[in-house]
Amino acid sequence: MSKLKLLAGIPATVTVALIGWSCETNRTALAPPAGGPLFHFQQFECTPLKMTGGGRIDYPPGTRDQNPPASHEYETFGAHVIASGQVDENGTCLADKGALEWVDHRPEMEVNGHPLNLHATEVTFAERATDASCSDGAVHWGGKLRVQNTGQENLDFEVWDCDNGEPGRDDGFAISVPEIGYTVQCWEPGYNTPAEPTCYLTGGNRQFHPTH
């Protein structure tokens, strides 16, 4: 059975194409997306850190307000990452460990009749963002994941993670999986993002711990 799956009818700039995976391994941290303004998550430092928690994002549009329940236009996730400030020979800030479980509940994003489910198999890098407007802390991290619906694996992913104080509805989160063209990102400060490219949480909470 072919592992090619194309999802059409996807709103805004979000596209998904689930394709066969490559045998090559790329452990390099991914660059922020091009083609738009990015005023946060450009300056980083390797330092001990820990980010924990989970949440819900009602994207699109990614504001603090929840979409109508019947629409199923939202995403949920659980995620954590821990780093001790170690750097490899290429200057990459190494992660000690981490996890990500991501579910996109939008009907148009279903794969094989089920919500799109992304599962991290390896978290390789984590760096503290020193320029993001996240009052308690911000982290850019990522690694490799698997599409649970298809078994497609060894896909690079990165997330932008923002703890913007309490309550959690001021926090933000964004994800990108370039090899399948999947992104959930927000770009309008004061409307749908506390710090580009993160989208406001409509549920849950992110907790930044500067050391562990």
Specify the residue positions occupied by each region the protein language model found.
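Mobile, glycine-rich extracellular loop/lid and propeptide segments
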Residues: A29-P37, G53-G55, W141-N149, I175
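A short, surface-exposed beta-strand/turn
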Residues: E153-S176
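Bacterial N-terminal signal peptides that target proteins for export
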Residues: M1-I10
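Predominantly extracellular/secreted and cell-surface proteins with exposed
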Residues: P68-W160
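Tryptophan-anchored aromatic micro-motifs
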Residues: F44-D65, W141-L145
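Bacterial N-terminal signal peptides
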Residues: I10-L18
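Edge beta-strand at a domain terminus
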Residues: E179-H212
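Bacterial Sec-dependent N-terminal signal peptides
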Residues: A17-F44
